[in-house]
Amino acid sequence: MTFRKSFDCYDFYDRAKVGEKCTQDDWDLMKIPMKAMELKQKYGLDFKGEFVPTDKDMMEKLFQAGFEMLLECGIYCTDTHRIVKYTEDEIWDAINNVQKEFTLGTGRDAVNVRKRSVGDKRKPIVQGGPTGSPISEEVFMPVHMSYALEREVDTIVDGVMTSVRGKAPIPGSPYEVLAAKTETRLIKQACAMAGRPGMGIOGPETSLSAQGNISSDCMGGQISSDSHEVSQLNELKIDLDAIAVIAHYKGNSDIIMDEQMPIFGGYAGGIEETTIVDIATHINAFVMSSASWHLDGPVHIRWGSTNTRETLTIAGWACATISEFTDMLSGNQYYPCAGPCTEMCLLEASAQSITDTASGREILSGVASAKGVVTDKTTGMEARMMGEVARATAGMEISEVNKVLNALVPLYEKNYATAPAGKTFQECYDVKTITPTEEYMQVYDGARKKLEDLGLVF
């Protein structure tokens, strides 16, 4: 049966008031894991240890499983404790009418984001930045300048302000609104000081409420050609605050970046099950959020990293499948275990950059070093590595990519529990000149040499 009109956030709100009642525990502990397990068995999904898939038939089965996951489960609204269901036609309408390309930024600093394919020879867009990591007020501009000064970086992804005027940006407070505006304004100024005043940014990251997110669209702050973030909840959940934010973004004709990080070992379960949920989450970004692009980020429940063997496999299969069967645009975010100025951090980020570039990601977003949880532990050097590795990987044969990854991941995966803490931005850079220390340059060159020995050609 056809639909009356294309589905949007207003329809979601209406259905969230009348949908099937469900407890959150039942959703998290029964509906999601049971359906994911059922679909894995139904379609016989087995990734056989490949980071980037070569089996097109298995990819098609994965897409069918992800589509079915969204169709049969729907999305859980945490405010109303009800399930929002879509019809099959509504889902296909969203998939068939996605934004096929868009521009981030303005003037000579603008970049065009358009579809890539598995093994594409074009380097993906590099969205460099702290990626939601906490950054102290005192070095907020210098940290973001360190990314804007890197030519490998095309756009900036914001960090979180730990304070504004010395006060915590508590959700719902006037300081949250001030922080959201200040975050985006300072980053715009940092880009201008780096000689790239038209550079696009992605955020806001500091605010946690709808009022905070909406307030970042302001004079001197975010504009329509910046990526505007809205986040889904784990797994296949959303709150009504986010729906209100989507309504604002749509009404303002903003580029919408729908974000979510599926958890391996969490509610979804194992590798194949989590990838099914990841596919469903991708599709939901375009049905519910009318997204311009979806920012992925499979993360390991124990290690808090996106660079593990399991999460790289999930990311590689999810992206390659989305790229093969749809025109949806997808990015991935980077959370290594190790901190800046360590070889491990650079190798972790490199493994993900190889996986993402080869599997067809349009945007690489990072790097949130030290798992993105330690204040001031992120710098432009990690984004440089992400970009250089992407450039070296673009166009490689997938069989060669998997061979490199099978050699690279063992170099760091035994060290998760003892990952080096690394150094703060202030210890990695001259804060006045925004240049990396000699120590970091040597660490960087050492990591680069190891990657060359594995077969990358810079």
Curated annotation (Swiss-Prot):
Pfam hit, one: MtmB
GO biological process: methanogenesis; methylation
Pathway it works in: One-carbon metabolism; methanogenesis from methylamine
Catalysis: reaction(s): Co(I)-[methylamine-specific corrinoid protein] + methylamine + H(+) = methyl-Co(III)-[methylamine-specific corrinoid protein] + NH4(+)
Keyword Transferase: yes
Molecular-function annotations in GO: monomethylamine methyltransferase activity
Protein EC: 2.1.1.248
Keywords associated with the record: Methanogenesis, Methyltransferase, Pyrrolysine, Transferase
UniProt keyword annotation of RNA-binding present: no
UniProt similarity note: Belongs to the monomethylamine methyltransferase family.
Subunit (UniProt): Can form a complex with MtmC.
Its job: Catalyzes the transfer of the methyl group from monomethylamine to the corrinoid cofactor of MtmC.
Name of this chain's protein: Monomethylamine methyltransferase MtmB
Organism, scientific name: Methanosarcina mazei (strain ATCC BAA-159 / DSM 3647 / Goe1 / Go1 / JCM 11833 / OCM 88)
